[in-house]
Amino acid sequence: MAKATTIKIKLLSTADTGTFYVTTKNSRTFTDKMTKTKYDPVVRKHVEFKETKIK
């Protein structure tokens, strides 16, 4: 069986609120750590979310 090319990752808020989004990424073409600017409802602002592993 072949290894999957898409993996699930967790995007964790850099505002230390504990807010996270779960998304997928292609691990072969995008090998860097993903960062996205998304909305954090706890602080009511757009903040940067960084990639962490799903436990």
From Swiss-Prot:
It holds the Pfam family Ribosomal_L33. The keyword Ribonucleoprotein applies. The keyword Ribonucleoprotein applies. GO terms for cellular component: cytosolic large ribosomal subunit. Keywords: Ribonucleoprotein, Ribosomal protein. Belongs to the bacterial ribosomal protein bL33 family. This is Large ribosomal subunit protein bL33. It comes from Agrobacterium fabrum (strain C58 / ATCC 33970). The gene is rpmG.
